Amino acid sequence: MELHKRKNIRLKEYNYTQNGWYFVTICTNNRRPYFGEIINNVVVLNEYGNKIEKIIKDYNDVSTDVINDFYQIMPNHIHIIIRLVTTGKHNIGSIVSGLKSKCTKELKIKDLWQKNYYERVVRDQKEYDSIVKYIVENPFGDKYYW
């Protein structure tokens, strides 16, 4: 019996410890709306969502090499722009893994997250601005592609 092998969705040959901005989306397992709800196009966080927000904000107080530049907590996923200030010191994969682990421990929900995460290397200011617009408009359900 052959087991399903997950496809690697990362860029080949890319150094994910390189300084710069990374747009990351982390989804809850089975897209369960653990963090709140959308009411009149506004995300209303519940207790879990507020705990997630505190964890994200606290991360900026812990490290000056990794900055959570911009984020939006949705009912069943998180959008976050992570900025690595120093090349070689941190890896996006380990940062996301640490964030997922801390949230899981704090919320005490087994299988809180999907196994993987989505990321996009932000290449320039125009793309950064488009991603911020997408994140801000996400509660409205609009499709926006950069």
What annotation goes with each model-predicted range?
Residues 1-146:
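Short catalytic/metal-binding and nucleic-acid-binding patches
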